[in-house]
Amino acid sequence: MKFRLIIDKNCEEEVVVYSREKTKLTEEIERIVENNAKELVGYIEREAYKIGISEIFCFVAEDNNVYAITENNRFRIKKRLYQLEEVVDDNFIKINQSCIVNVREIKKFDSSFSGVLKVVLKNGYSDYVSRRNIKIIKERLGV
């Protein structure tokens, strides 16, 4: 496969892929492009920031607010978790009533003798998987 990048400040960004058939690679390129195009507005105090969906490690509901957690920041989002579930792609999984994680940002799982499963993300954030979601997560991740 050949790759060609043309930088022209006067053009609108566009990705064109020529392929004989749809493959896992072309699907991955499509997913990356679509996710980078999706953005949310997040707030830190009174300042608003654009956040790409692909930058988000997880969404957490706390104290009647929803937060998007990225590698270095925590943004308040003016949407509910159920609304975010409709916006994000298949790389996000709801692990409990108050947390949706990006599976691409999972560093590891910690399990205890009592059967509790904890997800640890690459940025250090961790949360517990509810018992009813353990089976779903294992199936989705092929564990």
List each model region and its residues.
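N-terminal regulatory/sensing modules of transcriptional regulators
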Residues: 1-27
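Long, contiguous, secondary-structure-rich segments that constitute the structural scaffold
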Residues: 12-13, 39, 136
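Conserved residues at beta->alpha junctions
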Residues: 19-20, 71, 97, 131
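A broadly conserved detector of short glycine/acidic/proline-rich loop/turn motifs that flank catalytic sites
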Residues: 21, 81, 133
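Conserved binding/recognition cores within well-folded domains
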Residues: 26-126
